[in-house]
C-alpha cells in the first residue's frame, strides 16, 4: 500500500513538473473555417510531435466569438484572418500573407482563364460569408470591390468555407475565398487567383497579452513551421 501511495506521489510530482516546464497541460484553440485548408492541421501536427503530452482542444467558431472566448478564458489561442480589429487585452501574431481567389464551377467560362480580375466579377452571381461571420474581412472585401467600381451581386451567403465550395459545385455562383482554399479539392470546383489582392489577407494567431508558457511555445513553433 505504501508503495502505491509513493508511486502516486511520484507521478503527481512528475506531472506538476512537466506542467511547470511546458511539457504537459492543455491548450484550447478557437479557429475559423478557412484554417482547415491545411494551416491548422500543420501547426497541430508539428506541436503534437514536439509536445506529445500537451493536449490540444479545438473548436470551430467565428471571429467575434473567438475574441470573446479569449477574453473569457474559453480559448488560449484564436486562429483568425487579417484584417481584424483587436479588442483591448488581445494581441495578434501575423503569419505570412496570402492573396484572394475565386472558387469557380468547372463549367463556368472563367475556368478557362489563368486568373480573374475584380472587374470581371461585375454582374456575376457571387457567394460570400455573412458580415457577422467576420466584419473586418467582410468590410475589406466590399471596400476592394468599390475600389474597382464593382457592386457585388451576392446571391448566397454561407458562414463556412466548405459550404461555399459546395454551393459553387452546385452552380449557385462564384465563391470569393482566400487563396488557401484551393488546397482542398472539391468535385466540379476549380480556383483562380483574384488579381490585385496579393497580401490582402492571411492567418493571424490571437492571444491574450499575458501569455503562459504553453501558449508561447505554440507561438514560437508556429513562427518556425513552414506552411505549404
Each predicted region: which residue ranges?
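Alpha-helical "hinge/linker" immediately C-terminal to small N-terminal DNA-binding modules
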Residues: 1-18, 24
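Flexible hinge/capping segments at coil-to-helix
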Residues: 21, 92-100, 104-126, 216
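A late-sequence structural motif
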Residues: 39, 190-228
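Secondary-structure junction motif
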Residues: 125-148, 212-219
